[in-house]
Structure formats: C-alpha cells, structure tokens
Curated annotation (Swiss-Prot):
Residue positions where Phosphothreonine is found in the record: T228
Effect of W260L: Decreases interaction with AP1G1
Subcellular location: Golgi apparatus, trans-Golgi network; Late endosome; Early endosome
Keywords: Coiled coil, Endosome, Golgi apparatus, Lipoprotein, Palmitate, Phosphoprotein, Protein transport, Transport
Record-level GO BP terms: negative regulation of cell motility; negative regulation of receptor recycling; negative regulation of substrate adhesion-dependent cell spreading; protein transport; regulation of Arp2/3 complex-mediated actin nucleation; substrate adhesion-dependent cell spreading; vesicle targeting, trans-Golgi to endosome
Location of region: Disordered: 188-258
Post-translational modification: Palmitoylated.
Keyword Transport: yes
Coiled-coil boundaries: 80-138
Phylogenetic classification of the source organism: Eukaryota, Metazoa, Chordata, Craniata, Vertebrata
GO cellular component: cytosol; early endosome; endosome; Golgi apparatus; late endosome; transport vesicle
InterPro entries: AP1AR
Residue stretches of biased makeup (Polar residues): 188-206, 242-255
Protein name: AP-1 complex-associated regulatory protein
C-alpha cells in the first residue's frame, strides 16, 4: 500500500523532473529528482555550490517562485501553464515593439541617406552650371570675352595656329641662317676677294639675297658644283694663266682664282632674249674660242 502511494506521487512529479526547487534555509541551492532502481524508488539530493550556478553559462533555467511551488504542491498545473503563456505573450510583445522601433530607425536612416545624396547631386549640378556661366562670360587671358559662337571659335583657332606657325618659322629661320655648305663658304670668300680686287662698286657684286615677308635677309645656300663644272673651270683658269704668263695655280686655289669680266654688268640680251644671265662668262665658249685662236697662231708660226 505504501509503495503504491509513493508510485503515484512520484509519477506526477516525474513531469517536472527538470524544474528547480529552492528550499528555505541552509544557504545553498538544492535539487531533487527521482530515479528508479528496480522496484524500489528512492530520492537523491544533490548539493551544488552557488558559484557553479553562475559559472555555467548554458543554464537558462530560472528558479521557481513561491506561487509556483505552492501550485506544484497543490497540483495546479493548468494555472502554471496559463501564467507561463501570459509571460511569453508579454515577452513577444516587447520583442515586437523593439523590432518595430529598429525598423523605423532603419527607414529614417535610409531616408536621410537618400536626401543627402539628392542634395549633393543638386549642389554638383549647380556648381557645374555656375562654372559654365563663368567660363562663358569671364574674360580670358588675352583680354577678350569667350563666346560659344562658331565664328569666335574659328577665329581663336586661327590665332592659335598662326602663333604656332610663327614660333616654328622663327626657329627654322634662325637655324637655316647659320647653315652653310663648304661650296657656299668658298663662294662667299670668292665674292669677298672679288669685291676687294675689282674696281667695280658694290652694285656689281654677286650677293644673292632673298628678302622674306618679315623683312629679314637670308642668304640662299648655293648649289653644289659637279665634277664636270670644276674640271671646266680648272681648264679655263690654267689657260688664262698660261696666256698672261703668270704662275700656274694649284687645284685647291682654282675656285679662288676665278676673275670676272670688266663688263660683267651689262644690259645686253643673250641669243635667247634673256637678260637674266647677261654678264656671266661662259668658260666653255671661252675655252673653245681661245683654243681656235691658239691653233691659228701655231699654224702661222709653222
């Protein structure tokens, strides 16, 4: 009979086997549980240290209140379940309020970000418009107002091209004025010696100068003489030296020994009617005429 009472009593308490029960007095927390060893049922108590409860982070069990202990003793399990449901609803309501608050804060943050981006974009557009207006009406470095018209753009382009051309042209003139070939240098020496030895005035010189549009005088480099022309000049000079009885000149002084006719500057026309080459001495014709006269004198001597 006693075993049956114990079995019924502990069968009801088996459902609440994991629940905690605080026993008054003593100072320590005590737990009780039931276990069956064969047919005999015994109660075992475990005395736990309070510090162990704080050190166990995984334990989420809350201690039983006095009302719950009374309800357990009186077997009012429905009231315990109702109280737990009310507590769960209260917790869920608080969580819902917190979630709604977080959602509103996030929406306000997103709205503020969108508004800031819209304001930044508007400021950027206003700044670009202001810069465009300033560039359109602000005076440039040349003191002229810039305009977006096609004619003004074309004129400014022409001015830029002209300035670049002037710089390039001045650099080319300065470089070409100092470039002289060896034949040109010897020709310049020849003209200098001819001026000093001849009795003609400065108007009879062979200074070929070209006056460009900027008013600068630049000497045109002379064409380099070929080998045939040098041979003809050398033969003409040798014959003239033999005729006058002077000492023969060396091959290096042939170009410097060239003499000009006294009637170099003349207004006579040549056979073709061109006065451009009038006054120049043709060494080929001179050589042929002198050769014919020399052969005639030899025949008369014989």
């Amino acid at each position: 009979m006693g075993n049956c009472c114990w079995t019924q009593c502990f069968g009801l308490l088996r459902k609440e086997a994991g629940r905690l029960q605080r026993v008054g007095g003593g100072g320590g927390s005590k737990y009780f549980r039931t276990c069956s060893r064969g047919e005999h049922l015994t109660i075992e108590f475990e005395n736990l240290v309070e510090s162990d409860e704080g050190e166990s982070p995984g334990s989420s069990h809350r201690p039983l209140t006095e009302e719950e202990i009374v309800d357990l003793r009186e077997r009012h399990y429905d009231s315990i379940a109702e109280k737990q449901k009310d507590l769960d609803k209260k917790i869920q309501k608080e969580l819902a309020l917190q979630e709604e608050k977080l959602r509103l804060e996030e929406e306000a943050l997103y709205a503020a970000q969108r508004e800031a981006a819209r304001a930044a974009k508007q400021r950027k557009l206003l700044e670009q418009e202001r810069q465009r207006i300033v560039q359109q009406y602000h005076p440039s470095n040349n003191g002229e107002y810039q305009s977006s018209g096609p004619e003004d753009d074309f004129e400014s382009c022409l001015r830029n091209m002209k300035s670049q051309y002037e710089v390039f042209r001045s650099s080319r003139l300065s470089s070409d004025a100092t470039v002289l070939t060896p034949n040109t240098e010897s020709s310049c020496d020849l003209m200098t010696k001819t001026k000093s030895t001849s009795g003609n005035d400065d108007s009879t010189s062979l200074d070929l100068e070209w006056e460009d549009e900027e008013g600068m005088n630049r000497m045109l480099p002379m064409r380099e003489r070929s080998k045939t022309e040098e041979d003809i000049l050398r033969a003409a000079l040798k014959y003239s030296n033999k005729k006058t009885g002077s000492n023969p000149t060396s091959a290096s002084d042939d170009s410097n020994g060239l003499e000009w006719e006294n009637d170099f500057v003349s207004a006579e026309m040549d056979d073709n009617g061109n006065s451009e080459y009038s006054g120049f001495v043709n060494p080929v014709l001179e050589l042929s005429d002198s050769g014919i006269r020399h052969s005639d004198t030899d025949q008369q001597t014989r």
